[in-house]
Every structure is written in structure tokens, then in C-alpha cells.
Amino acid sequence: MATLQVDVVSAEEAIFAGEAKFVTLPGEAGELGILPGHTPLISRIRPGTVKIVRADGGEENIFVAGGILEVQPGMVTVLADTAIRAADLDEARAVAAREKAEEALRNAKDKADIAVVEAELAMLAAQAVAARKLRQTRNTH
């Protein structure tokens, strides 16, 4: 079966590099599914989970807080603002951080502070949802 090279990187580190059969991720206009030979594409990525079905059939799940996607017929590159391996996601910590950010939003004085906190809240909410979905998936298998 044909595969494609997938690279997921953040400013901190390379999270994944390898061959895959299939990739799904949250694109700006909705969920994207990418197979080998996909039409070239550049898109923004919304916060959510990148699911990679490796060439060996295993799966990698990576939370991204947004970023840029580049697709070429044999390659997918995800340049993430922040990327966290599913195994490292902590739903309780994300919920606690979201509560702290909500408090900061209530105390924000100017539009710039409000915009920064709102972006952080959106990312933390998506992270909590991703952690919950991944936990539920693990519990059903």
C-alpha cells in the first residue's frame, strides 16, 4: 500500500516523523482526511487532534493548538504552534488551566489582554476535549 511521509513539528521539538497510510486533522474549514497522492494544499489548522495511521497500522494521536498544514502528493507537514503527544495530555490539568484563564479574562482590562486570554481559552478547551475523547477511545478498546 502507498504511504506518505508525515512530519509534525512545533517550536519546541519534532513530535513525529515517519511513514503513514492516512492522516486526519482539524483544518480551518473542517476535518481533513489525507491519503497518499492527495492534491497539494496549504491550510491553517484549528486546535484539535492530529490522528496518524502509521504504515505498520499503529496510530499516533497528537494534540495541536493550531498551526499550518502543507500537503504534497507524498508528504504532509504540520507546523504546530504547540504540539502534545496524546499520552502526555492531562485533562484535569487542562481544565484547571482553563479555570485560571477564565479568571484572568474576568480581570482583563484592555482588548489586547482579552484577545490573548480568549485564544488561550480556546486552546485549553480544545485540549480538554481532545484528552477526553482519547481517554474514551482507550476505554472502549
UniProtKB/Swiss-Prot annotation:
This is ATP synthase epsilon chain. It is a peripheral membrane protein. Keywords: ATP synthesis, Cell inner membrane, Cell membrane, CF(1), Hydrogen ion transport, Ion transport, Membrane, Transport. SUPFAM superfamilies: Epsilon subunit of F1F0-ATP synthase C-terminal domain, Epsilon subunit of F1F0-ATP synthase N-terminal domain. GO terms for molecular function: ATP binding; proton-transporting ATP synthase activity, rotational mechanism. Produces ATP from ADP in the presence of a proton gradient across the membrane. PANTHER family: ATP SYNTHASE DELTA/EPSILON CHAIN (PTHR13822), ATP SYNTHASE EPSILON CHAIN, CHLOROPLASTIC (PTHR13822:SF10). It comes from the Bacteria. It comes from Bordetella petrii (strain ATCC BAA-461 / DSM 12804 / CCUG 43448). The keyword Magnesium does not apply. Its main location: membrane. F-type ATPases have 2 components, CF(1) - the catalytic core - and CF(0) - the membrane proton channel. CF(1) has five subunits: alpha(3), beta(3), gamma(1), delta(1), epsilon(1). CF(0) has three main subunits: a, b and c. Belongs to the ATPase epsilon chain family.
